[in-house]
Swiss-Prot record:
It is an enzyme of class 2 (transferase). It comes from Acinetobacter baylyi (strain ATCC 33305 / BD413 / ADP1). Promotes RNA polymerase assembly. Latches the N- and C-terminal regions of the beta' subunit thereby facilitating its interaction with the beta and alpha subunits. Belongs to the RNA polymerase subunit omega family. This is DNA-directed RNA polymerase subunit omega.
Amino acid sequence: MARVTVEDCLDHVDNRFELVLVASKRARQLARQGIEPTVEWDNDKPTVVSLREIAEGHVTKDILKQRDQDYQTSSLDLALSANSLNLEGFSFQ
């Protein structure tokens, strides 16, 4: 496994600040959303994998335009769940 440098990533992303945004968003996708990486995982952490993907040109700043999957449960879903479980007196706000 080769080391990833910021300079390698900056060939594909405009500046360091944008690199942080792109890498963190991709790392969250890998860690929380179960999206398959485009490079070998090699027992690395999601942040390292995301930087390797950027350095190899697989992930670009276009990822910032994508909407994140929303894992928050709506109040209606919670209320329906409480109703089906008969949780009387429990309030969802």
